[in-house]
Amino acid sequence: MGPVPELPEVENARQVVEHALHRSIVEVDDRDTYECRPHQPGDIAAVLVGGRLTAARRRGKAMWCETQSADGSTGPTLGLHLGMAGRIIVTGAHGSNESAYGGDPHVGERETDKPEWTRFSITFDDGGRLRLFDKRRLGRVRLEPDIDALGPDAAEITRDELRSRVGGSTAPLKARLLDQAVLAGVGNLLADEVLWQASMSPSRRANTLTTGELDKLRVVLRRCIRSATEHGGVHTGEVIGSRRKDATCPRCGAPMARGTVGGRTTWWCSREQA
């Protein structure tokens, strides 16, 4: 199994969705009752056809579109969740070779041509389409998704928010980073990358970090997110290739250690993150 889409992959997908904005919707295929649950076939189409997507938003790993209805009024929000390995594909006008891809970086363009793995699609009046390609069928499309339970976006969290939300708990540091109600968007690989770059133990109690250490953690977190977004995903991180048996730390050469923290498989430098 490849890495699950985390904040950087979802941000790349959100940027792809921007290619679909302000194009008139003429058809919606929402027949996949599992991917589009709890809606029935035709429910999503009924409110989107004739309208437009007007904005693409994201908080953490949650992504949604604002819409305009056929009569020009504000429409419902449309949630697009990538699941474990989903990908967004947006094609240009009919006859154009322009396509944009975002989401799971391990899905090849050849695979995305398989129509049976397109779980949801929107067709525009210019002949282009937006598709949710999801081989494993673990994504989700729904109207008015609930994002209120999510914490602040990990790429935008303020210094004071991180100090109180992450530092105010006796839980292991990695567990706090993974808690989407604390801050939204950090998954297993990104957490390991951030803690390795910050030289912090994943199992250290979060409330033992000093204010200076928490501020450093925020700087490193933002830097890792920015780098992963620019380079195509969390899998491009500096330590990710060393999350394996018999690997050594890319920085100091010490053996990489493996364990379970916060219920997730975790790798860290046995010397610098002890």
Regions from the language model: what does each represent?
Residues 1-274:
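Structured catalytic/nucleic-acid-binding cores of DNA maintenance enzymes
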